[in-house]
Regions:
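Small-residue-enriched hydrophobic alpha-helices in membranes
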Residues: 1-112
């Protein structure tokens, strides 16, 4: 699985973090996929995450974070995840927690 696909799956995890995949979040993920030229189905990814990780988003997040190793890919993934988090117009507690866990996993150098 490419780093781009892992980044998109991380975006799906962020969208699911607040207990729902909203239309705004789905649209933002599809927009990102188009920008990076990846054919990506958000609903298939959601199903895969729920099946593969039994709905445990922390485990899914750790898995996808660990699969993104290049510095520029980490910076890009961080920006994508932030865009998804803000796409519905508000940043919820679980989304903040998701970003904090990213910072802890990758280190402070990837966050402004």
């Amino acid at each position: 699985m490419s780093e781009k696909t892992n980044s998109l799956n991380l975006c799906v995890c962020m969208a699911l973090a607040d207990h729902g995949l909203g239309k705004d979040e789905t649209a933002e993920i599809l927009k990102i996929a188009k920008e990076i030229k990846v054919d990506f189905n958000v609903h298939n990814a959601t199903d895969e995450i729920n099946e593969k990780f039994s709905g445990d988003l922390d485990v899914a997040q750790d898995f996808y974070l660990g699969n993104i190793t290049k510095d520029n890919s980490k910076l890009q993934a961080k920006e994508f995840v932030k865009r998804v988090a803000l796409s519905d117009g508000e940043l919820k507690d679980k989304e903040v927690r998701f970003l904090v866990r990213m910072k802890q996993a990758w280190g402070y150098q990837y966050f402004d």
